[in-house]
C-alpha cells in the first residue's frame, strides 16, 4: 500500500450530502475482485449521460458537462471535498478502490459512513472529518479560486488552505501509523513473518500428524 505523509493536492467538489457507495461505483461494475479497473467508472452515473457497462470503452461515451469532475479546472485532483454522510449505503470495498485509482488520496467531509471510513484507511486513503462550518468555508474558497490546493500534513494532523488558514483533524494513532508506513492488513501481517514461521515450525514438532502429507 502507498504510504501517506503530506499531500499538496488540487481539491475537487462532491457538493451533495449522503453520497452512497452505489453512486461512487455502480453495482454493475462489482463483478471483479481485483483492486484495479474501477477508476474509469468512478461516479459513472454522474460523469456520463448514458449507462455504463463493464468492459465498455468510455472514450466515446457522452459526458455530463455539468458534473464538476468533468471540468478542466479539476483535472488531476487528489483531494475530494464532500458533504455529510459520504460513503453511506452498502459496504463495498470497490468504492475506495475506485476513488484511489481515479487519483483521490484524501477525502474531507463533515461525516462519513463507518464502514466506508474504515475501508479508506485500509486502502491508503485518508478520510478527514472537519466541522461542517469549516467544510462550508473550504467549498466557498474552492469555488472562488481556480487551482485551489490543500496541504494535508498527516504527521501534524493539519489541513492548510492557500490563504494560510490551518485546521486540525483527529486520526486514530494506529491508523495514522499504518498510513505513514504504507501498511495494509497484509503488510501488517508480514511484519510478523519470522514469528509466524517460527510458530509453525514449533507447532509441526509438537503435532507432526497435522502436517503429514496425505497419501
Curated annotation (Swiss-Prot):
Pathway annotation from the record: Amino-acid biosynthesis; L-leucine biosynthesis; L-leucine from 3-methyl-2-oxobutanoate: step 2/4
Keywords associated with the record: Amino-acid biosynthesis, Branched-chain amino acid biosynthesis, Leucine biosynthesis, Lyase
UniProt-listed Pfam families: Aconitase_C (PF00694)
GO cellular component: 3-isopropylmalate dehydratase complex
SUPFAM superfamilies attached to this UniProt entry: LeuD/IlvD-like
Region forming the signal peptide: none
Superkingdom of origin organism: Bacteria
Catalytic activity: (2R,3S)-3-isopropylmalate = (2S)-2-isopropylmalate
GO molecular function, one term: 3-isopropylmalate dehydratase activity
E.C. number(s) listed in UniProt: 4.2.1.33
Gene3D superfamilies assigned: Aconitase, domain 4
Enzyme class: lyase
Subunit structure of this chain's protein: Heterodimer of LeuC and LeuD.
NCBIfam families referenced in this protein's UniProt entry, alphabetically: leuD, PRK01641.1
Family the entry assigns: Belongs to the LeuD family. LeuD type 1 subfamily.
Protein name in the entry: 3-isopropylmalate dehydratase small subunit
Amino acid at each position: 500500500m502507498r504510504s501517506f505523509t503530506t499531500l499538496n493536492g488540487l481539491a475537487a467538489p462532491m457538493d451533495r450530502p449522503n453520497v452512497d457507495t452505489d453512486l461512487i461505483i455502480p453495482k454493475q461494475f462489482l463483478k471483479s475482485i481485483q483492486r484495479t479497473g474501477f477508476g474509469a467508472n468512478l461516479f459513472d452515473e454522474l460523469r456520463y449521460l448514458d449507462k455504463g457497462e463493464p468492459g465498455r470503452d468510455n472514450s466515446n461515451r457522452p459526458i455530463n458537462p455539468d458534473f464538476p469532475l468533468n471540468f478542466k479546472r479539476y483535472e488531476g485532483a487528489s483531494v475530494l471535498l464532500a458533504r455529510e454522510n459520504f460513503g453511506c449505503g452498502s459496504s463495498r470495498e470497490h468504492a475506495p478502490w475506485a476513488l484511489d485509482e481515479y487519483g483521490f488520496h484524501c477525502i474531507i467531509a463533515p461525516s462519513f459512513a463507518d464502514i466506508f471510513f474504515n475501508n479508506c484507511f485500509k486502502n491508503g486513503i485518508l478520510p478527514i472529518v472537519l466541522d461542517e462550518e469549516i467544510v462550508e468555508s473550504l467549498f466557498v474558497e474552492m469555488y472562488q479560486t481556480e487551482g485551489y490546493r490543500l496541504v494535508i500534513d498527516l504527521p501534524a494532523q493539519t489541513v492548510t488552505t492557500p490563504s494560510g488558514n490551518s485546521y486540525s483533524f483527529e486520526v486514530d494513532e494506529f491508523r495514522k501509523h499504518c498510513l505513514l508506513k504504507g501498511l495494509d492488513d497484509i503488510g501488517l501481517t508480514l511484519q510478523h513473518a519470522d514469528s509466524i514461521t517460527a510458530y509453525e515450525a514449533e507447532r509441526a514438532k509438537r503435532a507432526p500428524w497435522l502436517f503429514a502429507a496425505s497419501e
